[in-house]
Amino acid sequence: MYTCSIIIYILTFWQLSKIKKQVAAAEKQVMTVTEKQEAVAEFYDKSTDAWEVFFGEHLHDGFYEPGTTATIPGSKVAVVRMIDELLRFAGISDDPEKKPKTMLDVGCGLGGTCLHVAKKYDIKCTGITISPEQVKCAQDLAATQGLESKVSFDVGDALDMPYKDGTFDLVFTIQCIEHIQDKEKFIREMVRVAAPGAPVVIAGYAARNLSPSEESLKPEEKMVLEKICDHIVLSWLCSTGDYVKWLTPLPVQDIKVWDLTQNITPFYPLCIKEAFTWKSFTSLLKMGGWSAIKVVFAVKMMAMAAEEGLLKFAAVTCRKSK
């Protein structure tokens, strides 16, 4: 275990040292939107089984009290708590007369959010993801838990969702928008399918906001974020300020931002500890191949970037105007 950890740490720092040379090298091949979507679908199709072993049906970060030590049993509670905390921040009511009747989870993964919300809040949930393998897993989980009548899952494009305007009483996404190239269009699409008065919740990773004197991130900061994105098939990372800017001209109100970075960072040491054992490392390699292993490298870089204040985890919520 110790030898494996040392090797992985050396490789991680070696990769970070190569960032500047790689960025300054030949121009990267430009992928079309379709190719990027296919890459994201392939990434999750190949790595879903591997990460499900470690984190269950929730493929997103958990909510921890700052400074706590995360554990595997605790992480399964934390990922569910993250959902509840985001819904609380969005003002979701427990009152049967006021709570949403329907919810859409964009980028639903294995369906964990839909299954939890359907059970706890008695809300009919729909999930959409670009990965056919994830839809199959989500449908199997719903059947196992006896929730087929309360949840449904679709394979679809988040930029062109197959739903009518104003369909859902709550529109939710967590750790999906990072994969999307046209984030402004993604946000417009989420608002489009939200019913009048419906909360819209966007949560995930973001770059730090710029100071008034800055026009862009520093070159070395851009390099680090590009490397992280490359490892986990993210398109690029904008700031929460960008989200607010894109939401402002849309028919929404009550825009709020919540920085949750300190609430997710206890997860990093746990992930690194568990994934960097020889047993876990070889298991990830066997089940998920290089796609799963690259996530391990990314987690270390993400922990460093978050500690330096470059990488943020945040939520932006609003309500569609009536």
Swiss-Prot record:
Pfam families assigned: Methyltransf_11
InterPro entries xrefs: Erg6_SMT_methyltransf, Methyltransf_11, MTs_g-TMT, SAM-dependent_MTases_sf
Protein name: Picrinine-N-methytransferase
Region (SAM motif I): 103-112
Assembly: Homodimer.
Free-text function comment from the UniProt entry: S-adenosyl-L-methionine-dependent N-methyltransferase involved in the biosynthesis of biologically active monoterpenoid indole alkaloids (MIAs) natural products including vindoline. Catalyzes the conversion of picrinine to N-methylpicrinine (ervincine). Also accepts, with low efficiency, 21-hydroxycyclolochnericine and norajmaline as substrates.
Catalytic activity reported: picrinine + S-adenosyl-L-methionine = ervincine + S-adenosyl-L-homocysteine + H(+)
Misc note: A signal peptide was predicted, but with a low accuracy.
pH-linked activity: Optimum pH is 7.
Gene name tied to this protein: PiNMT
Pathway given in the UniProt record: Alkaloid biosynthesis; vindoline biosynthesis
Region span, SAM motif III: 193-202
Family annotation (PROSITE patterns): SAM_GTMT
Upper taxonomic lineage: Eukaryota, Viridiplantae, Streptophyta, Embryophyta, Tracheophyta
UniProt keyword Oxidoreductase, yes or no: no
Top-level taxon in the UniProt lineage: Eukaryota
Family to which this protein belongs: Belongs to the class I-like SAM-binding methyltransferase superfamily. gTMT family.
Top enzyme class: transferase
Compartment annotation: Cytoplasm, Cytosol
Signal sequence region: none
GO molecular function ontology, one term from the record: S-adenosylmethionine-dependent methyltransferase activity
